Curated annotation (Swiss-Prot):
Entries under Pfam families matching the protein: Phage_Mu_F (PF04233)
Protein role: Involved in virion morphogenesis.
Name of the protein this chain belongs to: Mu-like prophage FluMu F protein
Domain of life the protein comes from: Bacteria
Natural source organism: Haemophilus influenzae (strain ATCC 51907 / DSM 11121 / KW20 / Rd)
The family this protein is said to belong to: To phage Mu protein F.
Length: 414
């Protein structure tokens, strides 16, 4: 959740990584708008009802009408028009993020993607430059030109199989060497008069030139998938170890993230045909990552981003576990991200063939097994650490394993 005065302070992939509302200065305001927007999208609420419900809440919080910003400039806060834009933008980005996820899951069967514009009087001429063009799913063009590509963009992507392409004699294009980048002005700083600039990508085709709108130079789907990876890459540039550790812990403690993980568990637990798609369960902290590297003498290095796939959730929820009395309840599986965030114990399993991290909640006698780094198939592919199992644990056995040297205590006390 990010707070900002100007939308261009949250350019590109931040739109997919954080619910952002320009000029929201209170976390309570932002949380209220986010909650109402998520509910509206989930329930199919119309714009009028959305605005009618949200306006009195925002007025009560003092986020409505005109006000002075921190520099004394007059700014427009909440308004029906702004709320309408918020709802429309979040609806379209949510739709395309979900569509991207589905297409990535099926990319082996449908490895070609076709750009489809609406092609009516409202369609931007630049977007028509890509209409009907087909590129491989792994072509770099989709990193920045997967819709939406501007405010109000209605374009979409259609996935095609090898058979469909060959049987219909369709032409496959490549963006290799064709993509260009240029600067675009997205705003003016009222205090300094300085132009606020960002980078946008463009490509020329035989149908014209396609240029992404300022602030949309990213893929909403891959950005949502790659949230934690991108955050970690940024955090590794922070030289202050304590600050880096505090930031990771703050991310791990996010209630919104815990709820998202719990919702994912409840939606996938017991589902037939579990896939390799995954959900973030948190981040491996700096101290634990350093301990893993030290204890393995550099043989193992945590990737820091911790995920759980549908397949591993299904494995943890196996009949074997439940028949053996170690299976968890749905609520306990949903609590895995909380155990990762604040474990009672963190251990390293030194047994040959294991070499895993173990997160334990002593009160609930639950252990979460982590593969560092992940060796299993996941979609989309990414360098991560992965939760491979979770079940009830006998704490007396944990003590025996520690005494015998099979486990090494990295954090916590028995």
């Amino acid at each position: 959740m990010n707070i900002t005065w100007n939308w261009y302070e949250q350019l590109e992939s931040a739109h997919a990584r954080a619910f952002t509302v320009a000029k929201a200065t209170k976390a309570e305001v932002l949380d209220t708008i986010r909650w109402a927007t998520e509910q509206a999208i989930a329930n199919g609420t119309g714009e009028r009802e959305y605005i009618k419900k949200l306006e009195p809440m925002l007025k009560e919080l003092g986020w409505w009408g005109k006000a002075k910003d921190e520099n004394g400039n007059e700014v427009q806060l909440g308004s029906p028009r702004r709320l309408r834009t918020i709802l429309r933008t979040n609806k379209i980005t949510a739709y395309h993020a979900a569509r991207y996820a589905q297409q990535m899951e099926n990319v082996d069967e449908q490895p070609y993607w076709r750009y489809v514009a609406v092609n009516d009087s409202r369609t931007r001429a630049s977007h028509l430059a890509l209409h009907g063009k087909i590129y491989r799913a792994d072509d770099p063009i989709w990193q920045t030109m997967y819709p939406p590509n501007d405010w109000g963009c209605r374009c979409r992507v259609e996935a095609l199989s090898e058979y469909a392409v060959q049987s219909r004699g369709l032409k496959i294009s490549s963006s290799d060497g064709e993509m260009e980048m240029e600067e675009a002005v997205v705003g003016i700083d009222k205090d300094t008069g300085e132009e606020i600039r960002t980078t946008v990508s463009k490509i020329k085709t035989d149908q014209g030139e396609m240029k992404v709108g300022a602030g949309w130079n990213y893929n909403v789907g891959s950005a949502a998938f790659g949230t934690d990876v991108a955050v970690l890459r940024k955090l590794q540039q922070v030289k202050n170890r304590e600050l880096r550790q505090q930031t990771i812990q703050a991310i791990n403690n996010s209630e919104a993230r815990h709820k998202a993980f719990a919702d994912w568990v409840l939606a996938n637990l017991g589902k037939r045909g579990a896939s390799a798609r995954y959900m973030s369960a948190g981040l491996v902290t700096t101290e634990i990552a350093e301990a893993v590297t030290e204890i393995t003498q550099g043989g193992k290095n945590a990737e820091l981003v911790l995920v759980m796939s549908e397949k591993r959730l299904a494995h943890a929820n196996s009949d074997k576990h439940h028949e053996g009395g170690v299976g968890l309840t749905a609520e306990e599986y949903a609590s895995i991200s909380r155990i990762v965030a604040n474990p009672s114990l963190v251990l390293w399993d030194t047994l040959e063939g294991h070499n895993n991290l173990i997160y334990i909640n002593q009160e609930r006698t639950i252990q979460v097994i982590v593969d560092v780094p992940n060796k299993h198939s996941i979609k989309p592919k990414e360098k991560v650490d992965a939760i491979i199992n979770a079940y009830k644990v006998d704490m007396n056995n944990v003590k025996r394993q520690l005494s015998g040297g099979n486990y090494v205590l990295l954090k916590g006390k028995l």
